[in-house]
Amino acid sequence: MIQPISGPPPGQPPGQGDNLPSGTGNQPLSSQQRTSLESLMTKVTSLTQQQRAELWAGIRHDIGLSGDSPLLSRHFPAAEHNLAQRLLAAQKSHSARQLLAQLGEYLRLGNNRQAVTDYIRHNFGQTPLNQLSPEQLKTILTLLQEGKMVIPQPQQREATDRPLLPAEHNALKQLVTKLAAATGEPSKQIWQSMLELSGVKDGELIPAKLFNHLVTWLQARQTLSQQNTPTLESLQMTLKQPLDASELAALSAYIQQKYGLSAQSSLSSAQAEDILNQLYQRRVKGIDPRVMQPLLNPFPPMMDTLQNMATRPALWILLVAIILMLVWLVR
């Protein structure tokens, strides 16, 4: 433990201080000096896992004191400087841990991890992420938060019609299990949704070319399930392959047409899932997002024509005349 405010310092037997040589430098620490050291030590221990006894032993070692030598007034400047340096290092380490935790949230989204790796390699060489300075980490975090970092498109592998490998199937199974736990939706129902979206019939094997699309769909649904008010922008951040201009325009139009909302509006969970499904079908099947006509109005173009004719009697007269003429000719 750190030396107490009163009494002999640790390691000094009672009465030993009375035999110290005279002189200011050989006097025990003053109360003010001890208080200053204790304050610094408290700050260091609050930011690190070090115990006071361990920290105190390290300080004595660094300033060249043997285990049984008392800390004197002349040792105070070196001890204070040592603690100040330890505090500075602890503050930097604590700041770096906080920034790494914030970065971790972004690295899970889309292709951000590859973007950060490329940025570090280009600007900081081969330095690992956890060895960057707080200033460097802050720069990367700010670029991600402000959307100024270039996010590369994920590498596209050649599509194949082979069925999923066991490892690929197990990977999907694990993602389905996580999604079921997060949403409460039965795993069987999630699998059924995946098959229907992919156009795979019951009993057929899922082709491997759908693997990456299904992984993205499952991971996006997992992330969206944790958002109370998802938006098209937050949906886009869940994607490994960001929306291109045509996809963004198509989905924005779909949201406006079906839900009467803008691209910046908050969505319900069901709406966000519907939009994600539309994007999946566009990427897998090339089907543009569309609003299905209601079943009670299967012939909307014809109904619109009849409604227009109802407001123009002359068209009805002409139509009746044409019908009568056709009947007369047939007879």
Curated annotation (Swiss-Prot):
Q: Name one GO biological process term.
A: regulation of gene expression
Q: Which residue ranges traverse the bilayer?
A: 310-330
Segments for region (Disordered) = 1-35
Any idea which UniProt keywords this protein has?
Cell inner membrane, Cell membrane, Membrane, Transmembrane, Transmembrane helix
Which ranges sit in the Periplasmic compartment? Answer: 331
Cytoplasmic compartment ranges equal 1-309
InterPro entries membership: Flagellar_regulator_Flk
Report biased composition (Polar residues) as residue ranges.
19-35
Keyword Transmembrane tagged: yes
Instruction: Offer a single GO CC term for the protein.
Output: plasma membrane
Q: Which domain of life is it from?
A: Bacteria
**Cellular compartment(s):** Cell inner membrane
* Biased composition, class Pro residues, residue ranges: 1-13
Look up keyword DNA damage and say if it applies.
Answer: no
Membrane topology term reads: Single-pass membrane protein
The job of this chain, per UniProt, is described as: Acts as a regulator of flagellar gene expression by modulating the protein level of the anti sigma factor FlgM upon sensing ring completion or hook elongation. Flk could inhibit FlgM secretion by acting as a braking system for the flagellar-associated type III secretion (T3S) system. Plays a role in hindering to flip the flagellar T3S specificity switch from the rod and hook-type substrates to filament-type substrates prior to hook-basal body (HBB) completion possibly by preventing interaction of FliK with FlhB.
Q: Which family does it belong to?
A: Belongs to the flk family.
Q: What is this protein called?
A: Flagellar regulator flk
Q: Which organism is it from?
A: Escherichia coli (strain K12)
Give the source lineage, highest ranks first.
Answer: Bacteria, Pseudomonadati, Pseudomonadota, Gammaproteobacteria, Enterobacterales
